[in-house]
Amino acid sequence: MRNEMNLTFSALSQNESFARVTVAAFIAQLDPTLDELTEIKTVVSEAVTNSIIHGYDGNPDGKVHIEVTLDDHVVYLTIRDEGMGITDLEEARQPLFTTKPDLERSGMGFTIMENFMDDVMIDSSPEMGTTIRLTKHLSKSKALCN
């Protein structure tokens, strides 16, 4: 069965936990393992934080958009902003790379996403924003909704 959810919120750091919990609650209907749920929550947190901190540089007027699609035992996540975009995507995907060392950012966001998800696609254009598409195949999915 296919099920979808869309969520849009202001680019405020306090909304990161709201996004993480909302996505986890929606995905729970597939009965993921605790590890799978934790990995998805972590990835949502990383992507949303990137949008807020890097995409909008802390500008609360920006919006973060999340789309979640559940299709049988597969979770598809899209996290998008219309912020600054990424000028060098290859460099940004390198472990420990950060544009904000003064904020003590670890530069591991994309690395974490790539390790926890089955597929990660990033589209970004300077001054146009960034879209991250993530796919996760759940191991013991027993969809609870009919």
Curated annotation (Swiss-Prot):
Q: What's this protein's family per the entry?
A: Belongs to the anti-sigma-factor family.
Q: Which UniProt keywords apply?
A: ATP-binding, Kinase, Nucleotide-binding, Serine/threonine-protein kinase, Sporulation, Transferase
Q: What class of enzyme is it?
A: transferase
Which E.C. number(s) belong to this protein?
2.7.11.1
One Pfam family named in its UniProt record? HATPase_c_2
Reaction catalysed by this chain? L-seryl-[protein] + ATP = O-phospho-L-seryl-[protein] + ADP + H(+); L-threonyl-[protein] + ATP = O-phospho-L-threonyl-[protein] + ADP + H(+)
Tell me yes or no: is Transferase among this UniProt entry's keywords: yes
- Entries under HAMAP family matching the protein: Anti_sigma_F
Check the UniProt entry and state the signal peptide residues, or none. none
Please name the GO terms that the record assigns under molecular function. ATP binding; protein serine kinase activity; protein serine/threonine kinase activity; sigma factor antagonist activity
Q: Does the keyword Kinase apply?
A: yes
Instruction: Give the InterPro entries listed for this entry.
Output: Anti-sigma-factor_SerPK (IPR050267), Anti-sigma_F (IPR010194), HATPase_C_sf (IPR036890)
Name of the protein in its database record: Anti-sigma F factor
Task: Enumerate the PANTHER family for this protein.
Answer: ANTI-SIGMA-F FACTOR RSBW (PTHR35526:SF3), ANTI-SIGMA-F FACTOR RSBW-RELATED (PTHR35526)
SUPFAM superfamilies in the record, alphabetically? ATPase domain of HSP90 chaperone/DNA topoisomerase II/histidine kinase
Which gene name belongs to this protein?
spoIIAB
Q: What does this protein do?
A: Binds to sigma F and blocks its ability to form an RNA polymerase holoenzyme (E-sigma F). Phosphorylates SpoIIAA on a serine residue. This phosphorylation may enable SpoIIAA to act as an anti-anti-sigma factor that counteracts SpoIIAB and thus releases sigma F from inhibition.
